């Protein structure tokens, strides 16, 4: 079969119901047979049938690339599959010729990283951009919940306090709470209280509460009095009128009297009303 006729069939036939008498040989001639998988048919923009079983086109592309099946990869890309999945699949199976061929259609490795679950593949993908640094890798590891990357470089990071502090604050801003706990507990973070500033700025009550859980446990274990710390941030959230944060601070031992005094001073009626109702 001529290549032009085969190309026409690959484009037009998949949108139709394939005749039952099309055996594997005919489908191979048409370019619509995937070795070890079966017939291929496009049914929607993002869905195909593989041997009559529905599968997302991008998942199929990832599998085809992981098998090094150039023809099927090309076919699925012609059906508008996302080339990022070709890069991921090829990286996982170390088909680097395919990686470099299709990476050019993506251009930025950081657009691929969110699709990757395996830390080794994640790091290999990041290396596709030769201008990126380890600090960049660590930042994207935080943003994509790739803790094994940080664990691999723990000794390196532990000697780099500036980077550890930056990653800690990034995890706070991105609401990566497990990362926050791990970084604070394992690496050298010089200013843990920056967590509260970020939590208040972003109105992130969960992070705010997490901060107290982390810091107070350490202070109590060292027999330190947390009153100054609690009332320092209580003043901040009271002045801003952030009732949920006020209540959370009082829950951990902050002074209710300070909150009421500042609510009166800054005329935060909703805070005053809450305490009046609470006391009555």
UniProtKB/Swiss-Prot annotation:
It holds the Pfam family DUF249. Keywords: Early protein. Induction: Expressed in the early phase of the viral replicative cycle. Plays a role in virus cell tropism, and may be required for efficient virus replication in macrophages. Belongs to the asfivirus MGF 505 family. This is Protein MGF 505-3R.
